[in-house]
C-alpha cells in the first residue's frame, strides 16, 4: 500500500501531513511554507494559479480570484448564508441548474468541489515532491458540524483531484488525535476549533489509544472571514465619514481593504495598536486619496463583540449533550488561527473556567491528526481506536409534515437504525420517503438530503402495509437510506449523493479535466526547468567564449555562436523537448571550448611555482629547508 497523506482542507489555508518513521510530519510547499492559502485564481493568459501565487495577484484581479470556497461547498444558492456571501464577494456566485451555489471566473462556471479540488491537487503535488513518488490515498478533514451534502461534496473534491479518499474525518477529532496520541492517562477534552470559515466544539474522552467523541456542535458560517468582514466594514465606514467616498463600489479597493483588515487583526494579537496605511486607495476630482488610520485591540474587540458572543452557545450545548459541566473538562485545546486572538482566548477561559492549552500549533494540528489517521488506516499506527459521532439528527417526514428522527445527533458512527412505518391512505400503491437532517420538529425547517419512492405496494387498507426504513451512516458520516416492503420483500435504496450537486457524469468529466490540466501543468513545469537549464548553459558558454574564444579554431567558434543563437530562439517557446535538444547541441559544440579552458589552466602561470619561482630560489642561494611563510599585518 502506498503512502496515505492527511489533508486539512481549510477555508483560509490548507496543510498536508504524513507519517514517517512513526512520527507525523507537516510537509512544506514549493514556496517553503507549511500552510498554503486556499485560493484559486485565473489569470489573463488563462493560467490557473493556486495558493500563494493566487493570493499575491488578488488585488489586481479580484473578480477572478476565488477564496473561502469551503463556505459554499454543499450549499444551495438561495440559503441565507450564501446570500450573505454574495453581498460581499468580489467574484460572482451563481445559481447552478440544480440550485447549488457555484462560482464564475473568466466567463466559466465552476462548482465548489471543483475549486476545492484545485487546492487539493496543490497539496497532493506538495506531498509527491517531498516523497518522490505518486500519492493517491488520502484522509481529508471537514468541520465536525458539516452536514451530509458538505461531506459528500468534499469527497467529490478529492475524487476530482485524483485522490482516493479513504476517510473523511472531523477537524476537532483530528486535532484531539494529534494532541492525545502519546497520552496514556484518561482525560476529558474540549476541542475549540475556530478557523477561517467555521466554528466547531467537540467534547471527547481519550486515554490509552481510545478517542471517543461524546458530543459535537458548531456553526459552519462563523470564522476568521466574518471577523475580517467586520473590520473591512469599520475601515470603509471611517473612510466614508472622513472623505465622503464609499469604497464598497470599488472591487480593487475592497480587496486591498480585505488584506489590510486581515493584517491588522493578526497584528493586534501581539500588539495593542496597529496602523492601517493604504496609499492611493482611490481618487476624486481633487486628486488621489490615501487611507491612514489607527486600530486598537480594544476597538477590534468592540467591533467583533457580536461574533465573540456567538461562540458561547454551541459550547454550552456540547457540554450539555455530553452530560458534563465545565468543571469536568480536564483540558481545552485551541485549534484554528482565530484562537490566537486574545479576546477569543478570554472567551474560552470564561466559558470553561480554565486557561486553554496552547501546546499545539493551531494551524497544523488538524493536518497532523489527519496524517495519523492515515497511518492508522494503513496499519502503521497501532492501538488507536477513533469513535466519532454524527453531528445532526437524521429522519424522515411523516404525516402532518413532522420530522420523525431515526438517528439522534451525537450517535457514534458507523451506525445503522431501522424503524417500521405504514401507509397513510387506503390502497396506497407507493410510499414517498423524504430524508431529512436537522434538529427542528417540522420537516420544512430541516435540510432535505434526498427523496425516493418505494413503489409496487399491494392494495390494502391504510396502516396495514409494513414499510421498514433503514438509515446507515458510514465512518465518513455519509448517509445511505433504504426502504423495504416487509410484505413483498421489495426494496428501494438511496445513497445520498445528489445533494452534493454533482452527478457521477459531472464528477467524471471534472476528473478528466483535472487530469488534462495536470498534464498541462507538468508540461509548463518541464518547460520552465528546461529553460532555466538552457539559460545557465548560454550564460556559462558566452562567458567562456569571451575568455577563451581566441584559443579555438574560428570555425569551431562560429559553430558555438550559431548554437547559442538557435538555443535563444527556442527558449522563448513552451516546447521542453526542443529546448533540451538545443541545449544538448550547444553542450556538444562547446566541448572544444572546454578542452581549451582546461589546457589553459594546466599551463604554468607567469609567476607559477614551477619555473621562475623555483629558479629564483636557487639563484638567491636560499636554504632548501627554510619554509617561506605568509604573514598578515593586524592593525589595532
UniProtKB/Swiss-Prot annotation:
<dbReference type="GO" id="GO:0140662">
    <property type="term" value="F:ATP-dependent protein folding chaperone"/>
</dbReference>
<feature type="modified residue" description="Phosphothreonine; by autocatalysis">
    <location>
        <position position="198"/>
    </location>
</feature>
<keyword id="KW-0346">Stress response</keyword>
<comment type="similarity">
    <text>Belongs to the heat shock protein 70 family.</text>
</comment>
<feature type="region of interest" description="Disordered">
    <location>
        <begin position="598"/>
        <end position="636"/>
    </location>
</feature>
<keyword id="KW-0597">Phosphoprotein</keyword>
<dbReference type="InterPro" id="IPR012725">
    <property type="entry name" value="Chaperone_DnaK"/>
</dbReference>
<feature type="compositionally biased region" description="Basic and acidic residues">
    <location>
        <begin position="603"/>
        <end position="625"/>
    </location>
</feature>
<dbReference type="GO" id="GO:0005524">
    <property type="term" value="F:ATP binding"/>
</dbReference>
<dbReference type="GO" id="GO:0051082">
    <property type="term" value="F:unfolded protein binding"/>
</dbReference>
<dbReference type="InterPro" id="IPR043129">
    <property type="entry name" value="ATPase_NBD"/>
</dbReference>
<keyword id="KW-0143">Chaperone</keyword>
<dbReference type="Pfam" id="PF00012">
    <property type="entry name" value="HSP70"/>
</dbReference>
<dbReference type="InterPro" id="IPR029047">
    <property type="entry name" value="HSP70_peptide-bd_sf"/>
</dbReference>
<dbReference type="InterPro" id="IPR018181">
    <property type="entry name" value="Heat_shock_70_CS"/>
</dbReference>
<comment type="function">
    <text>Acts as a chaperone.</text>
</comment>
<dbReference type="InterPro" id="IPR013126">
    <property type="entry name" value="Hsp_70_fam"/>
</dbReference>
<protein>
    <recommendedName>
        <fullName>Chaperone protein DnaK</fullName>
    </recommendedName>
</protein>
<feature type="compositionally biased region" description="Acidic residues">
    <location>
        <begin position="626"/>
        <end position="636"/>
    </location>
</feature>
<dbReference type="InterPro" id="IPR029048">
    <property type="entry name" value="HSP70_C_sf"/>
</dbReference>
<keyword id="KW-0067">ATP-binding</keyword>
<keyword id="KW-0547">Nucleotide-binding</keyword>
